[in-house]
């Protein structure tokens, strides 16, 4: 059953009033594939717009906090932790890992996915002048802890 639909099939924000407050955590990732020279410029700190990883990290954190403004049926959440980690993978990829936590009545998967996605979009925005062919890919949930549905971890 899709929880965001009422009995008539209309969009509906889920009522979490009666749900217990529990610790919840979610981890998501995204990757940005680019030209090797673009990644080298980022890693060497030679991008004319500044520290690409620092700006993308802040954008991801801010995005997690704004998820309910972007995705209509998401609840506004009081996040207790948002961490966004960026790293070079190989010669042409940036990997972004976003982790969100809270003690609340609903999960934080969308916040983690939004953080990873917006960090990736920020990298694209900052680097598009030198590499328009970048590809944002593999945006996915890696792990979820807490809540009624329990623990989920992506299969390797």
UniProtKB/Swiss-Prot annotation:
Protein's organism: Pseudomonas putida (strain GB-1)
Signal peptide: none
Gene3D superfamilies reported for this sequence: Molybdopterin cofactor biosynthesis C (MoaC) domain
Subunit structure: Homohexamer; trimer of dimers.
PANTHER family: CYCLIC PYRANOPTERIN MONOPHOSPHATE SYNTHASE, MOLYBDOPTERIN COFACTOR SYNTHESIS PROTEIN A
The protein, known as: Cyclic pyranopterin monophosphate synthase
Family per similarity comment: Belongs to the MoaC family.
Catalytic activity: (8S)-3',8-cyclo-7,8-dihydroguanosine 5'-triphosphate = cyclic pyranopterin phosphate + diphosphate
């Amino acid at each position: 059953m899709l929880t965001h639909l009422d009995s008539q099939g209309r969009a509906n924000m889920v009522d979490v009033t009666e749900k217990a407050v529990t610790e919840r955590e979610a981890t998501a990732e995204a990757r940005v594939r680019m030209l090797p020279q673009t990644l080298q410029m980022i890693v060497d700190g030679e991008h004319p717009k500044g520290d690409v990883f620092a700006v993308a990290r802040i954008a991801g954190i801010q995005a997690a906090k704004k998820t309910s403004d972007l995705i209509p049926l998401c609840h506004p959440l009081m996040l207790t932790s948002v961490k966004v980690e960026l790293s070079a993978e190989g010669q042409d990829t940036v990997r972004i890992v976003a982790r969100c936590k809270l003690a609340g009545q609903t999960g934080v998967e969308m916040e983690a996915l939004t953080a990873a996605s917006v960090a990736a979009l920020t990298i694209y925005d900052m680097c598009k002048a030198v590499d328009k062919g970048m590809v944002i890919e593999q945006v996915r949930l890696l792990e979820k802890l807490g809540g009624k549905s329990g623990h989920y971890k992506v299969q390797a």
